[in-house]
Amino acid sequence: VLHKVVQVRLYPSKEQQILLAQTFGSARWWWNYALNKSIEVYKETGKGLGRSALNAFLPALKKAEDTKWLADCYSQVLQATTLNLTTAYKNFFDKRAGFPKFKSKHAKQSIQYPQNVKIVDSNIKLPGNIGVVKAKIHRLIEGKIKTVTVSKTPSGKYFASILSEVEGDVQATDEGKIYGIDLGLKHFAVVTDGEKVSKYDNPRHIAKHEKNLHRKQKKLARKQLGSNSRNKYRKVVAKVYEQVSNSRQDFLHKLSYKLVSDSQAVIVENLHVKGMVTLEDSLTLRYRNHNLAKAISDCGWGTFTNFLAYKLERKGAKLVEIDRWFPSSKLCSNCFYQISELPLDVREWTCPHCGTHHDRDGNAAINIRAQGIRMIKAEGSSVSAVGGEVSPILGRKSKFRHSPMITEAPTSTVLGKLG
């Protein structure tokens, strides 16, 4: 079974926009209420509230005078909100995400329909009182529709992310190239296939819009709090951020598509982006360096890895993530000698053992690729690799892990190839 996600643009009528706003508000209020109730119960008893316990509050809330408007919301939307909250708690306790946060009406709004959504005459029919919403469906929706997430961006656009389930097995492939990728700031990605090293420049998306963004943020700051003009100008600023996000997603999709199209495996480092940009203590989360944090966040390394993962999974190819502590830059790819220190400002170095001169990032990509091939062979999979014999690392071996396959696809489409 394969899961696919297609995002489509929605064009609701004025009446439907009002109904969607009410549904967004109900789901957001219920999320915040359930989260607050869970926190209170945990403080009192030391135990949390499960999905069933939270849903048990809904019937009484729908009958109460102050919250009877909850009854107007499609019931499965509220139940899906409960499920998402309990999933957020599970991810927190499994150390895959931070603690669940309260939702704001000024952020992106979203609701989820777990079933009963249909495609009608190239439009989308939502259950409940919203009905058929005009949509721009740009590609075929394959298989059975499982869930549909309807969202509204801060700039005022509506989208539906359609998750479908397609029957059939994906055959694993052992044909194609094996890429090793070193992600960075000057060059977004340094890639090797065992024969040559290619460098892809960092587009620096935020830097291109920084002056425009700064100018519009200053105008927004001068607007009176709570005024209509401030609310309208908030959308103007949101549109600039949306342009930045769209250009980043476009670049990441095109580059990931280019690499996946002719590969049997892609090998990357398991980077801890949050640890790179912040210092975490018991009281707060602080930036290590504001400019560096902004540059790293702008790259979208984590999103790029996710894009690689789901594209490779659909093809039957592998994504391998090597341990972040693997000394890819300090290890000579020719003789496997490891130097003790290599400051960030040193971009080239010569191995004192064999005399090979290295480009820092190119050497790292070669080592990442070699380590990934060792991992693939260690688990018993066959690969056809070019670029010479892969030798074992001298000395102590680093720890590494094989990344799980990702079934959740991102909500953007591939627009074409690079270059």
Model-based region annotation:
Residues 1-78:
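Gly/serine-rich nucleotide phosphate-binding loop at the start of the catalytic core
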Residues 6-10, 131-135, 200:
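Generic detection of short hydrophobic beta-strand segments and adjacent strand-loop junctions
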